[in-house]
Curated annotation (Swiss-Prot):
Single GO MF descriptor: mRNA binding
Protein name: U6 snRNA-associated Sm-like protein LSm1
Main location: cytoplasm
Function, in words: Plays a role in the degradation of histone mRNAs, the only eukaryotic mRNAs that are not polyadenylated. Probably also part of an LSm subunits-containing complex involved in the general process of mRNA degradation.
Residues bearing PTM Phosphoserine: S123
Pfam families documented for this protein: LSM
Domain of life: Eukaryota
Family, per entry: Belongs to the snRNP Sm proteins family.
Residues the record lists as Phosphothreonine modifications: T129
Gene: LSM1
The keyword Phosphoprotein appears for this protein: yes
Keywords noted in UniProt: Cytoplasm, mRNA processing, mRNA splicing, Phosphoprotein, Ribonucleoprotein, RNA-binding
């Protein structure tokens, strides 16, 4: 096989359906329409998929331009196996509410963890304070 270096190898994947995982945790699914040398992507008929437990919801986003430095994972979706998922599709409102509840639960657990460490004389620096030099 003849492999092309870097992002040039993605030229073969243009016009195929892809899943893109972004640095901020979002998951996008759409058709790859364009790519450049910096791995900037243009996705068409894009949906943002939100997973909570065994449920998922799709939010239509249309044409989506993704800066290459924000891409964590890019993978082609097998159209034949796409419908064989064990996940249940729910409405946008329902998945957003479940996501909010899940995030609130995680926040409460983190607060309890920080308080338990504080009671023992330990502390974890907050993530936003680590950015300052």
């Amino acid at each position: 096989m003849n492999y092309m270096p870097g992002t040039a190898s993605l030229i073969e994947d243009i016009d195929k359906k892809h899943l893109v995982l972004l640095r901020d945790g979002r998951t996008l699914i759409g058709f790859l329409r364009s790519i450049d040398q910096f791995a900037n992507l243009v996705l068409h008929q894009t949906v943002e998929r939100i997973h909570v437990g065994k449920k998922y919801g799709d939010i239509p986003r249309g044409i989506f331009v993704v800066r290459g430095e924000n891409v964590v994972l890019l993978g082609e979706i097998d159209l034949e196996k796409e419908s064989d998922t064990p996940l249940q599709q729910v409405s946008i409102e329902e998945i957003l509410e479940e996501q909010r509840v899940e995030q609130q639960t995680k926040l409460e657990a983190e607060k309890l963890k920080v308080q338990a460490l504080k009671d023992r004389g330990l502390s974890i620096p907050r993530a936003d304070t680590l950015d300052e030099y």
